[in-house]
Amino acid sequence: MQSRPKSTMSKSSIGKTARGFATLLLAAAVAVTGSVTAFAQAVPVVRDAEIEALVRDYARPIFKAAGLANDGVDIVLVNDQSFNAFVTGRRLFINTGALMQAETPNEIIGVIAHEAGHIAGGHQQKLRDQLERAKTMAIIATLLGAGAIVAGATTNSRGLAGAGMGVAAGGGEMAQRSILAYQRTEESTADRSAITYLNATGQSGLGMLKTFARFQSALSLSGTQVDPYRISHPMPQERIANLEVLVKQSPNVDKVDPPALQQRHDMMRIKIAAYMGGQAAATRLIRKAPGSLASRYGEAQMAYLYGNLGAALTKANALIKEQPKNPYFQEMRGDILMKANKPKDAADAYAKAVSLDPVRSGLLPVSLGQALMAIGTPDSLKKAVVQINNGLGRDKENTVGYRYLAQAYGELGNIPAAELATAEGHFYSGDYTNAKIFAMRAQKDLKRGEPGWIRAQDIINYNPSGKLKK
């Protein structure tokens, strides 16, 4: 809430008012105007090979329909229990809360389609342009108000001076409402684009309507009175009204998700509930379909998380017998065996997971490398380095992987490589200061011109703007 303005306004305070409003706009649009990398690093990210593969399967046909198939859009899972998704740059962030609350794949696919509409429509760049216009609007209003204040003071007119203060204060409000109105328009455009993509891929839009109905129900239950002109999204009921006819006229309106996809979705929900929602949340989902594959998967996860490793291993083995080609059952078996301090058996399970993985996730080789490190022999450490490097080659931003790689190199006595791996970990964490320190330390013992030396030099030359120093 803004305090009441004083009766006089200096040039300094005019500048502060204009700059303050500009800062407010920029803060509100941090995902649009800020550094994408820095913003992503501030988000509590969740990494899981199984969930990432499923969400990418949801997104692939939608991205193709939106013309984004070859644009390298990254999908990032956020550890947040609220139902939300958003885009920054070429990254689509989806909260684990949305994945757990959505009862069908179609609901999440609708969310992805909406966000794809923002990316394909270039809405972020357009919002940047709108922000610049809004800043100009606020500055002009502030200056006009200041002029009226000066005129009022010169003529000893309190009314004119008061009107001037109203203009100055109202300029920011006017610009803010302009931005919000623009954002609401873009949200509606993204909704319509989403329906287009869903139709193009032969999928129903009912999931989108269900999502908006969920928002409307939550709003009604909260009892909150919302000014529709002071929010960045249209009201849920308005969004339903705008889309309902389009959805119901579609020949795909009654299409349902394939049973195999629904099963993977159910397994994902229970997994998220077990890890992030706690025992009560997981138990609620397990009881909805007792005896199902998803419920038995959840029971195995719960046994593992709560230390009943014997039961967890028995349940995991039963799941593997039922689906021997499922890489994530083998991954879970490896997790259980690692917790049971059986790294050799865990390494065998992780190796099977890596060989079965159709999407070649970078996470699974790192898990295999971790198990090989735990074995602790020189031969297993060398194999660990190979596996972790394989994983990082597929997924360069896996900062945990660099920590394991540095440790493995250190135990093998390869200190320059350990320091370079540490530099890489800091670099992808956004800690450029320490990244440069370790890169310089690594360079001292690396041969000039070799790949490691060149990579260290790239890190040393890097600046947060994303450009190399000349």
Predicted regions and their residues:
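Structural motif corresponding to the intra-repeat A-B loop/turn of tetratricopeptide repeats
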Residues: Y306, A340, I375-P378, L412-G413, ...
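Canonical tetratricopeptide repeat
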Residues: G298, M332, S367-L368, Y404, ...
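Residue-level recognition of tetratricopeptide repeat
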Residues: Q301, D335, Q370-M373, Q407, ...
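Catalytic Zn2+-binding segment of zinc metalloproteases
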Residues: A116-R133, A151
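Extracytoplasmic and endomembrane cell-envelope/extracellular-matrix remodeling and assembly machinery
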Residues: Q41, R47-A49, A53, I75, ...
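Short coil turns that delineate tetratricopeptide repeat
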Residues: P290, P324, P358-R360, K396, ...
